């Protein structure tokens, strides 16, 4: 009887331990939590670690958290294990690391190698499976060696863009230059190398040192023997983009679209209705123009109007203008041809190159009435209100969807009312999502961004607290004509400055 009791006790104990083990496994966090006390030490111990810079109030961070944890769990069993970590970059004690790594929005992920000596932006997916696949590739060699025809077929494939270096030996200046570029661009491009060009699946055998870039479009492969660092990088980047990038709903085209918009070249974009009667004729003529201008530092894209709503919103375009061509230069000047016809494409490009096409400015209409305390500025009125008015102007660049901008609006109204009897001061706002901004004067990377331009033209960014009294003090200090006295100041707002919303990109 005693034995049976002991047996029952043993079974219960084992079950308890088993359940406890399961619960422990369920509650275990695989993402390392870093702060100012352990950040440097932890990074220095890892040859490869990913760090998420986040803020607790950031909605995108909250959405990423469970996917990041799932990925960390799976990668913990990788050989060798890959570490994922996070740090609250909004915490005052941790802000030194946010500054060190130039964090401008949340979440931002960085890949740190060699104990933090090498830093790379994470540009991969934001769901668990994609994170795992991306990081497994990133943790491997920057360039894989091809030792057989079978391995070459596997690496190059039919749909991959791969730069393959061919060398007589795996050493020397050319090899070192190639490997350095592979390491630099490993996040966005695939690299391989071989001692025998006969393994390569396409093209005649090439004598090394040389680089053959394989691609599933246009001429299918292209060679280069220039191993100068800048020239080699330019070759890889430019050769990896189709002569004419296609922007539609096909996910296979999306990586090329991303590379197109990342290119520093002048970008020519034609948007048409792909199912329209003249679509094929338009695309054919556009490709002819692209072919004849391929050496003119122009990148070409043709987009289906139905799949390009984001581009339409960004450039301020209307569907009634389709088919259209818009050109964007590296200094952000834009040139627009709306309702273009087949026989106008070639001549319009010639006019553009001859400097005969006027710059297009994205702008909302100038408001018929502008009687509110905070004056509405649009691109077309920016010169008159800000640059040529001879006034001291505090201007907010905002986005309608930005929560911080919405909270700031009533405060700026109060500031404007306090200066209503001072004709030398203007408090203004501009919707930066609907109007072009002169980037050489105003550097707008997040919302809200606030600038002050004095009556004589001195421009300074506002970096103070977002309270009525702080704004008033700032304007009085920087104005070149002393404003009159103002009303009683309100109590300071407790809302801290945050930059979850970023203008340059959607963090997810």
UniProtKB/Swiss-Prot annotation:
One of its GO terms (cellular component) is plasma membrane. Disulfide bonds join 58-61, 402-405. Widely expressed. Keywords: Disulfide bond, Endoplasmic reticulum, Glycoprotein, Isomerase, Redox-active center, Repeat, Signal. The keyword Glycoprotein applies. The active site is at 58 (nucleophile), 61 (nucleophile), 402 (nucleophile), 405 (nucleophile). It is found in: Endoplasmic reticulum lumen. GO terms for biological process: photoinhibition; response to endoplasmic reticulum stress; response to high light intensity. The record marks 466 as: Lowers pKa of C-terminal Cys of second active site. The record marks 126 as: Lowers pKa of C-terminal Cys of first active site. It catalyses: Catalyzes the rearrangement of -S-S- bonds in proteins. Residues 474-508 are annotated as: Disordered. The record marks 59-60, 403-404 as: Contributes to redox potential value. CDD domains: PDI_a_family, PDI_a_PDI_a'_C, PDI_b'_family, PDI_b_family. Residues 1-24 form the signal peptide. Its EC number is 5.3.4.1. Induction: By chemically-induced ER stress response. The keyword Ribosomal protein does not apply. GO terms for molecular function: protein disulfide isomerase activity. Glycans are attached at residues 38, 273. It holds the Pfam family Thioredoxin_6. Acts as a protein-folding catalyst that interacts with nascent polypeptides to catalyze the formation, isomerization, and reduction or oxidation of disulfide bonds. Belongs to the protein disulfide isomerase family. NCBIfam families: ER_PDI_fam, pdi_dom. This is Protein disulfide isomerase-like 1-2. It comes from Arabidopsis thaliana (Mouse-ear cress).
